[in-house]
Structure formats: C-alpha cells, structure tokens
A protein has these predicted regions:
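Membrane-interface micro-motifs in multi-pass membrane enzymes
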Residues: 130, 239-244, 340-341, 433
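Short, solvent-exposed loop/edge-beta patches enriched in aromatic
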Residues: 95-97, 288-299, 328-330
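Solvent-exposed soluble domains appended to multi-pass membrane proteins
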Residues: 280-286, 300, 305-652
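Membrane-interface segments at or immediately adjacent to transmembrane helices
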Residues: 207-297
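Short hydrophobic "helix-edge" motifs at membrane interfaces and signal-peptide entry regions
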Residues: 87-88, 290-292, 511-513
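Short secondary-structure junctions and interdomain/linker hinges
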Residues: 119, 146-153, 166, 178-179, ...
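Transmembrane and membrane-interface helices of multi-pass
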Residues: 2-238
Length: 652
C-alpha cells in the first residue's frame, strides 16, 4: 500500500545472450528499504493529520492565520484530536491506495470543512455541528443564506486548493511511485488484505468517535483525561478553547435529556396531580374564553429593537409603531436562546413550553434531533384543537428546513403552508418573501375558515444575508463603516416590518370575529454587529428581543412583563386573556413566578437578577425540579403525564 514502485532495470548493453532489460527479473528490495519506506509514509500521514488539525482549530477563530501563530497549541486535547484525524487520514490512504493522492484529498476536505466552519461562525455565530449535514440536501438554502461574493470567493478558493492538492499529489506520485502495477500473486493479495484490515480498523475507530457521548466511550475517556473543560454554554468558545475536533465530537448524537433522579410513573403522576389541582384553583377566577377567538403566533425573523443597544444611535427609531404598541398592551423583553440564529429552537420553546436550556447542550436543533423522531409530540396545538381551532402553520420559505413538515405533523397542525402554497409571494425589494405577503396569508386563512383558526407564522423578510436589498437604508452611528452599512439595510427591513405589522393589526380589527396575537423577534440579527459589541453591551442585552400580546377584541391592560423566556409567551397570552388553562400551563405559570427566563447556565429570578442554578431559592429549585421531570416525560420518557397535563380545561 505504502511502498514505492521499483524502477525497471535499464541496462543499455546489448551483448549476445543478454536478457533484454524489460524481461530481466526485478531486484528485490532489502527489508531495510521496505521498513524505511513504511516509516516515512506513516510519518507523512501523522504530519498531515497534525497540520489538518491545526487548520481546523484555526477556523474557529475570527482571524485564522493569526490563530495559527498564537493559538495552535492551546487545546489540552491537541494530540487526541490529531489521533482522530490520523485515523481518518489512514482510512483515505487505505481506500485510495496512493499515499500522495490520498493526502491531496485530505487537504481538500480539510480546507472545505475549515472554510465552511469559518463562514458559519461569521454568519450565524455558531460553529459547524454534525447535525449540519442535513443542509447538504438543501443547497438552495445555502445559496440564499450566503452572499454571491462569499460564494464566488469560496468556490474559487476551493477549486484552487483542490487543483494545488491534486497537482502536489501527482508530482509526489511521480517522484515517489507507489506499488508496481505488475505486482501479482501473494504480494498483491497480501497488500489487499492489509488495506482491507486498515479500512475496517479505521471504520471501527471512527464509529467509536461517532458515538463519543456514549457511556464508557474510550475516545471520550481519552479526551476527558486531558483535563479540558467542555464549554457547553457557549459552543463557539468550546471549539476555540478545546479545538475543532473536540467540539465536533462533543456535539455527536446524544440522548436529548438525561433522566432525572427518581423518574417513575408514580413520581410523574404525583407531579401531574399537583398541577391539576393548581390549574383548578387558578381557573376558578378565569372567565375568559378563546373558543371563538382566532389566535395568531408570529415569530418575526431577526426582529429586534436596535435602540436597546447603547452603542448605536439612530436619528429616529426604526420601529416606532411597535414601540408605541408596547406601551398600550401586554409586552416585554424576550430572552432568546441564541444570537444570530436558532429560529427553530425558539419555535420549539414557544409551541411546546420546553426549554432548550434543560436539554443536553449537544442538541443544537430540537426539531431535527428530537421532535422529528416522534410521530406525535406534546404541544400547544393540542390545546387549540381541544378548543375548536383549526391549526395552520405558515413559513414563506422551503418546506424542508429543519424537518418542519414532520415536526408540524407531530405537533398536530392540520396544514403547513410554505412558499410553494402561498397566495402572495412578493419580495418587496428583499431576498425573501416579505412580511406583507406573510401577513396577508394569515388573513386568507382566517377568512377561509368558518371555525376559529390557530395560525403559527414564521416570517423570512429580515433573514440574513444583509446588503443591497434597499435603496433607503437606516444607518446608525456607533459602528465601523462596513458594519453600519449592513445595519442600515437591516434597519430598513425591520422598519418595513413595523409598518406591515401595524397594517396587519388594523386589518384584523375589521374582521367580524376577535383575534389574539402574540408577536416576537426570535433573535438579534447576525452579521451586522462586531464581536466587540458583546463586551460593551453585555451578553444578556445581545439576546433580548421585543414581544407583544394584543387582542382585536377587548383591549388588554397595559402590562410590562419581566424578561421572559419563549416558553412563557403562550402562558402570558392565556393570563392576559383570562382563560382557563390545563395543568401543563399551570406548571409553567408556577415556574414563571420563580424563574421568568432561563438560558444555558443562566437563570433570571423574579427580581430580574441573573443567578446561577445553585443560588436559586428553594421554591425556584422545586418548581424547576417539577418542570424537568415533566419535560423529560414529554420529550424522552414514557409520557405518563401527557393526558393529564394537557387535559382540556373548562371554558369560561
């Protein structure tokens, strides 16, 4: 496999009776030469694995070349990472059978992964996860998410790397030829056996790496023995401090949630009975009803209030109508579980009441890694079905994103309308279907149904990338020029959303039946703010977006709620509308009184203070323990409590 082809003897003499050169027997190599060749070849694979590891580690930093110089040896698990990459290198060499060609292929793969990781970090502030492989089947999404300039740069760079790698492999193969083509018999058979054995061993080791999070996994034990700290609360830092390979392995498949201590049917039933009694107590004073009211939940892509950032100054707020509305109805700040991305996870939290912060950190997209694995999944859709609503989900983009068709079906939605089924598909100058078209689709659904409708809308207008959409940007001061231009495009986009949302509410007021609306932004936009802003603004401020709860019927009393998790938005709607609730929402209300908002490693108490889990009050810890038990039962467990916790509450 790794040997060098013997050069044919080329004796120019033509004496009588001499055997022609091409028919002369090859001189066998000495065992020493074989050993030296093998050692050198193996050394090259180790060197390539080492270099590939350094390149991948550097791709987790904003300035990769600088990281290569100053950060290359910081990972405590560097050599364990090299070992994993080396196994992959050996696999490619054994499969290809030509050392230098195989190393060229490894170089190209390393470059591709590094570029993709760096680009994803720039655009979404998140590193590359194993679960991102699903996007390979959605090239249209990738092309729309990345600017044309980035695509051209990436394509040219990749082609250049592949050409250079192929040329290098070709040249080295000429200088150091491989196994002779004429090799036959036992020699060829032996070579093939060795290659097959290497392939099988490498596949076995890589399979172990793929099960990195299994109890007793030897790879995990080796990495843990180095003393590295898994930064599960911040995956970007996790990849930077522990290395790309460590971060990637850490995010391999895992059970979504660890079983809480004492989980059993008896324990779950006891909690369910407790909150059934609490719901009955709360419902005694609730006389409202949603039975004849349309309910619309609107996840507004990338919507935020940039004036909340102290570093930015605008001549006028981009969202004056929304700000005015927040002073008239129920509203507040939502603590988004992510920055620049995580739309599907915010959806998951709102519709299920289950917090991403309580799942294992390796669950990067709950829709794909949890919900889509089930035929049914407990959600608010069941509540609305029980109250006579027709549930409809609308998303003006590709239907395949984040396994939404399977997820919405599991939740219980009757229909999912993607961009292919929408009646209006205007773009309004932007890359994606605009919010006016999305709001019009909601109006169509309400008008087309006799019974009340529960409509869940996820918009696309303000999705990245930003740049070149609008001719009338709203640029702030306080940002570097290149960021200010992008922020100006974003500012104009949310200004249009602000206007279109106000028009949508005005249209709802004209309908004969009442409609309740929950509107929120899923996260701050990626790409437009420098990393330095996190230091000046603070992590919490970079994760807060506005939310509004509004009714076209009886106006809701103005209330500014404490900082809220997405899981609490529907409970706040039910509170504002004074409607009876099932036990699950009684549990969420109880949790809200103690911990209104939480994120990975962060809890905000009733006094709006950031506290660690260990510093929670006994009441808060008890509510969280109950919540985690039922959450596990819903998501991973036996669902002993589903029927009781979602039991239809009597209408007022």
């Amino acid at each position: 496999m790794l040997g060098l082809r013997q050069r044919a003897a080329d004796d120019p003499t033509t004496e009588a009776g001499a055997v022609p050169a091409e028919e002369a027997p090859r001189r066998p190599r000495s065992p020493l030469r074989h050993a030296i060749t093998l050692v050198l070849a193996l050394a090259m694979t180790v060197l390539w694995a080492f270099l590939a590891t350094l390149v991948l580690d550097a791709s987790a930093w904003p300035a990769p070349l600088n990281a290569l110089r100053h950060k290359s040896f910081e990972s405590p698990a560097l050599w364990e990472s090299v070992a994993v990459v080396w196994v992959f290198v050996l696999l490619v060499v054994a499969l290809i059978g030509r050392l230098w060609i195989a190393l060229g292929i490894v170089t190209a793969i390393t470059a591709l992964i590094g570029v993709v990781n760096l680009t994803k970090l720039e655009l979404r502030n998140d590193p590359l996860y194993p679960s991102d492989v699903v996007f390979l089947g959605q090239p249209s999404f990738l092309f729309e998410m990345v600017s044309k300039a980035k695509l051209v740069e990436g394509a040219v760079g990749l082609v250049l790397i592949v050409v250079l790698a192929a040329g290098f492999g070709w040249l080295m193969n000429k200088l150091f030829p491989g196994v002779p083509r004429s090799l036959s018999g036992r020699g060829l058979l032996g070579l093939r056996i060795v290659r097959v054995v290497v392939v099988l061993v490498c596949l076995g080791l890589l399979n172990l790496a793929g099960n990195f999070n299994d109890p007793g996994n030897p790879w995990r034990a080796a990495f843990d023995s180095t003393g590295l700290r898994w930064r599960n609360w911040d995956q970007r830092v996790n990849y930077q401090r522990n290395g790309f390979v460590s971060g990637l392995l850490f995010n391999m498949h895992i059970t979504a949630m660890n079983e809480p201590k004492g989980y059993s049917k008896a324990a779950v039933d006891k909690i369910a009975e407790k909150y059934a009694a609490e719901a009955a107590r709360m419902n005694q004073g609730r006389t409202g009803s949603l039975d004849k009211t349309n309910v619309v939940t609107i996840l507004s892509e990338g919507f935020s209030d940039p004036t909340w950032l102290k570093s930015l100054k605008y001549a006028a707020t981009p969202i004056p109508r929304t700000e005015a509305l927040m002073k008239k109805t129920v509203s507040g700040k939502m603590l988004a579980p992510g920055y620049g991305s995580g739309t599907a996870n915010v959806e998951f939290e709102v519709l299920t009441g289950l917090s991403m912060s309580q799942l294992e950190p390796q669950v990067s997209v709950a829709y794909e890694q949890l919900v889509s694995q089930h035929k049914t999944f407990p959600s608010a859709v069941q509540y609305f079905l029980d109250h006579g609503h027709t549930p409809v989900a609308i998303h003006p983009f590709s239907p395949r994103m984040y396994a939404r068709p399977a997820v919405y079906k599991a939740f219980g939605f009757d229909r999912f309308i993607s961009k292919d089924q929408m009646q209006d598909t205007r773009h309004g100058g932007g890359r994606f279907i605009d919010d006016q078209s999305a709001f019009d689709e909601v109006l169509h659904q309400i008008k087309d149904h006799q019974q009340p409708v529960f409509t869940h809308l996820v918009t696309m207008q303000n999705h990245m990338p930003f740049g070149g959409q609008y001719t009338d940007p709203l640029e702030p001061t306080g940002l570097p020029k290149n960021f200010a231009k992008l922020a100006g495009q974003y500012g104009r986009g949310i200004a249009r959303t602000d206007q279109e949302f106000a028009s949508f509410l005005a249209a709802l007021k004209k309908l004969p039946e009442p409609t309740a609306v929950v509107f929120w932004g899923d996260h701050l936009p990626p790409q437009i703010y420098p990393q330095s802003l996190f230091k000046t603004e603070g992590l919490r401020n970079m994760h807060q977006t506005p939310f509004v709860i509004w009714s076209s019927g009886t106006p809701l009393k103005h209330t500014t709620l404490p900082t809220t998790s997405p899981t609490q938005l529907l409970p706040h709607l039910f509170d504002a509308m004074n409607v009876p609730i099932p036990p699950w929402y009684a549990l969420l209300d109880t949790l809200d009184q103690q911990i209104p908002a939480m994120d990975a490693g962060l809890y905000i108490n009733g006094q709006d203070e950031e506290v660690k889990r260990a510093d929670l009050t006994p009441e808060a810890r008890k509510a969280l323990t109950d919540y985690r038990m039922i959450m596990y039962d819903f998501s991973v467990g036996k669902r002993y409590s589903e029927k009781t916790m979602y039991e239809n509450a009597p209408t007022g």
